[in-house]
Amino acid sequence: MAIFWGINIRKTIKLRDLNHLSEIFHFYDTYIIDLWGVMHNGISLNSKAIEAVENLRANSKKVVFLSNAPRPSFKVVEFLKRLKMSDKFLSQVITSGEAAMHAINENKFGNKFYHLGP
């Protein structure tokens, strides 16, 4: 059982217990799915999660994978390929590292900043 919280244009769905994605898949056009702990455990892919994503795509749902990795998205895609994730899933991978890099390149933090971390 998972706890689900979702947003659509018309309303916010409150936290609730969710037994299966099929209970809510028709509410949304796009699903943003975390990678670590959902799609993989760092060693192997989660076959049930892969099946769920395949079902979403078969029902014309968009899927975006999100990661808090401090690396560019292409590095995470390379890692997912090593885990044997199909290329058909890898066009929409977004990382916090990629978002930060774009923000820095667009000068969204000013001219001076201090980076602390990897």
For the regions a language model picked out, list residue spans one by one.
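HAD-like aspartate-dependent phosphatase fold
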Residues: 2-118
